[in-house]
Amino acid sequence: LTYVFEMEETTFFKHYSEKQQENTLIDICIQAQKKVNRLVPEVPFSNIWIAKETADRIPANSVIHFGILNSLRSWNFFETPEDVLCYANTGGFGIDGCLSSCIGAAISNPKKEHYLIIGDLAFFYDLNSICNAIPCNVHILLVNNGVGTEFKNYDNRAAMFEMDADPFMAAKGHNGFRNSELVKKLCANLGVMY
């Protein structure tokens, strides 16, 4: 230790709080986002498109839960209403528990509407959680595209296998493969409104 400055904490914080705040990083991020929005005005139907079209339509004072990785990443590009709380169960950093976490949060906070944005692999993986009574304040947006889209991203290790990643890592053609009838019948059999 070379230098010691002894003073009251209030003196220290008062001095630095009087400085004009510089939000340069956030300003850079906002400008970058605006540039991306200008360069890519039309997004093709995809997880990003779903996020773009729905982010500002989530009802005020509600809660969004995101499936891990692709859902979460896609929605990070768009603004949700300021009073909407956003969560993602990233504890296991995998597909396990997104659906059950949302249901648990909705049970513990029944005065708020809870929306879950989840991919098909995560949904089917955690399907057991809807076998019990789901509170009426849970709404699920299932992106049933038949494949683990995350494994298609250039920065995912599975991407180097290209189409060979489909059957082994991206689970293309899994049991629920783009089958809305399967999901509809599962919900009907479990007494869940589809």
Cite the ranges covered by each PLM segment:
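Hydrophobic beta-strand segments of well-ordered beta-sheets in folded domains
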Residues: L1-V4, S62-I64, N137-I140
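Structural motif
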Residues: L1, F66-N70, G119
